Each structure stands twice: as structure tokens, then as C-alpha cells.
Regions:
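OB-fold single-stranded nucleic acid-binding module
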Residues: 144, 152-155, 186, 247-249, ...
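Beta-strand/loop nucleic-acid-binding surfaces
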Residues: 234-253
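Hydrophobic helix-and-loop "lid/oligomerization" segment in the mid-to-C-terminal part
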Residues: 1-154, 158, 174, 178, ...
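Anionic-ligand-binding alpha/beta catalytic cores of soluble enzymes and soluble regulatory domains
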Residues: 153-208
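Short aromatic-glycine-enriched beta-strand elements
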Residues: 220-227, 272-276
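Structural detector for short beta-strands of small beta-barrel domains
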Residues: 201-223, 260-262
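Noncatalytic, beta-rich nucleic-acid-contacting surfaces in large DNA/RNA-processing enzymes
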Residues: 108-112, 214-216, 274-279
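A residue-level signal for conserved active-site and pocket-lining positions in enzyme catalytic cores
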Residues: 12, 192, 263
């Protein structure tokens, strides 16, 4: 199993859904049968988390009608606190602008933010706390969490807008190398393996291919897409897009015939075929 994308979300699910003891008991149990029981419960919690997350994202997407906002703020007192960070990250990636997602916790507003970079939003949260705008907050360059009184919502919003107004937050897509599709093969993947493990201080390389035709081959769970990327010479590679707005993507690729495509090179878990995970297209 893939530790980051398969096991990780399940181990985290207990804590996200407010029952962190489940994951602790799973990992510390000396009895494989008891561990299996906890594993089953945790998997159910992860499915519950996914349903809540999908519902909130669909609600937000159906209500967003102004993509010119400098920053996106989303708030609903009924949203589950455990999924705010995931949702903020996905909205940031899809909208290409900082996104802050908030809900109520007792008498306060709590939230999570994700940013493209440019400004350190973790530092901004600490500055806001020092100025008394929020009760507490912190994080790092691209992610933050915060708590504030409801009466401080407008001052907090104005504080962030003022900070971002002169900042370049809509960044150009960064990539390591311009590639022909013919170079996406086992040799490239073997070379990339030498650079691993990837993480915060060693990010996985992103590549770019120009003048690529994109065809949707299949859609999974209404949000994941299998695509065929083809160049002008007929060379092709399979590309995957995850957690995407399928209808918006279909509409976008109908606007023109060729795109610049940004992606990571991967090996398919099931077929062992070399594929790409699409990060963005223009």
C-alpha cells in the first residue's frame, strides 16, 4: 500500500472525526485480531470523512460565482472541523488562490488556510494574534490554523486582504524540465527514484509538456479522471487527475485543441505502467 495516499488518510481519519484513540489503539495493539477490528472501524471513519468532505466541497463549488476574488473565504457553522484543512487545500489548488475554510467551535470561529506561497500565512496568523485580531494561530508558509471570536471576523478578513493586496499570490506554474512525451518512460522513472524520498524539503519534480491534446478516457467516483495525453506526432501517455470538478474540466478542455500540461511522473499501482499525475493545464 502507498503509505501517504492509502494508509495515511485512514490512520488520520480517527483524529479527524474526533476519535483519535482508534488510531492509537490500532497501532499499539499487540493482538492482530483486535488490530483488525480497529482497522475496520477506522476504515469506516475514513469513508464517513470522505462523504462529509465531498458534501462540503460540492456545496462550496455550487455557490462560487466570482473567481476574481483575491482570497477565498468559506464559512459555515455546521461544517465538520476535522476536514477543514483538506478542503482548504483542494480549493486552493483548484481556484489557484489562497483559501480559508471556517466553522464554529463552541462560541468561536475556527479555521484552516492554504496558500500558494509568496506570503508566509503561518507568520501572518501569529501577527494577527499579536495584534489581538485572532485568539491564536500559526502554521508555516503554505498552511495555517486559527481561532477567533465571531466579532473579529471582519477585522480578520480585512487584515488578510490588506496583507495580500500587494503580494504576488497567483504564481506561475513552476516546473523542473520541459519534456517530450516520448521521454516519459521507465528510464525516467528509475532516475527519479534515485532522488527520493520526496517531501517538504525535497519536493517531487513537476514536468511540463507543450501543445498536448487531452482526451478524457474514464471518470471514477465523479471526481477522478483518466485521460489520454497526445502530442502532434501521435505519441501518447496516460494521465490521471484526482479530486477534480469533472464538468468544469470538460468545459475547459473544449475551449481549444492543445494545452501546456504540468505533471508528476508515476508508476500505476495496478498495471505497473508509467503514467503521469496531472497537476495543471493551460
Amino acid at each position: 500500500y502507498h503509505l501517504g495516499y492509502v494508509l495515511g488518510p485512514r490512520i488520520n481519519a480517527g483524529g479527524r472525526m474526533g476519535e483519535s484513540y482508534l488510531s492509537f489503539n490500532l497501532l499499539s495493539s499487540p493482538n492482530i485480531h483486535i488490530a483488525a477490528q480497529y482497522s475496520s472501524v477506522i476504515n469506516g471513519k475514513n469513508q464517513e470523512r470522505q462523504k462529509i468532505q465531498t458534501s462540503i466541497i460540492n456545496t462550496i463549488n455550487s455557490g462560487v460565482d466570482d473567481n476574481q476574488n483575491l482570497i477565498n473565504f468559506f464559512y459555515d457553522p455546521t461544517w465538520h472541523i476535522g476536514v477543514l484543512g483538506i478542503i482548504a487545500g483542494r480549493l486552493m489548488r483548484s481556484n489557484k488562490r489562497p483559501s480559508f475554510v471556517m466553522t464554529d467551535s463552541e462560541n468561536f470561529i475556527v479555521g484552516s488556510g492554504r496558500s500558494l506561497g509568496g506570503l508566509n500565512i503561518g507568520t501572518l496568523m501569529m501577527e494577527a494574534a499579536d495584534k489581538g485580531i485572532i485568539i491564536k494561530g500559526g502554521g508555516h508558509t503554505k498552511a495555517c490554523g486559527f481561532t477567533l471570536e465571531k466579532k473579529s471576523w471582519e477585522p480578520f478578513k480585512l487584515f488578510l486582504l490588506d496583507k495580500f493586496i500587494d503580494s504576488t499570490i497567483i504564481q506561475e506554474n513552476f516546473y523542473e524540465l520541459l519534456l517530450d512525451l516520448t521521454l516519459i518512460n521507465n528510464n525516467l522513472l528509475n532516475d527519479l527514484d534515485l532522488l527520493s524520498p520526496f517531501g517538504q524539503n525535497n519536493p517531487e519534480p513537476i514536468f511540463k509538456s507543450e501543445n498536448v491534446k487531452i482526451e478524457i478516457v474514464n471518470v471514477f467516483k465523479d471526481k477522478h479522471m483518466k485521460c489520454k495525453l497526445s502530442d502532434q506526432l501521435g505519441n501518447s501517455v496516460i494521465g490521471m487527475m484526482f479530486d477534480s470538478n469533472v464538468e468544469s474540466f470538460k468545459s475547459y478542455i473544449s475551449l481549444k485543441n492543445e494545452f501546456d500540461c504540468y505533471y508528476k511522473v508515476k508508476r500505476d499501482t495496478y498495471s505497473s505502467q508509467v503514467i503521469v499525475h496531472i497537476e495543471d493545464i493551460h
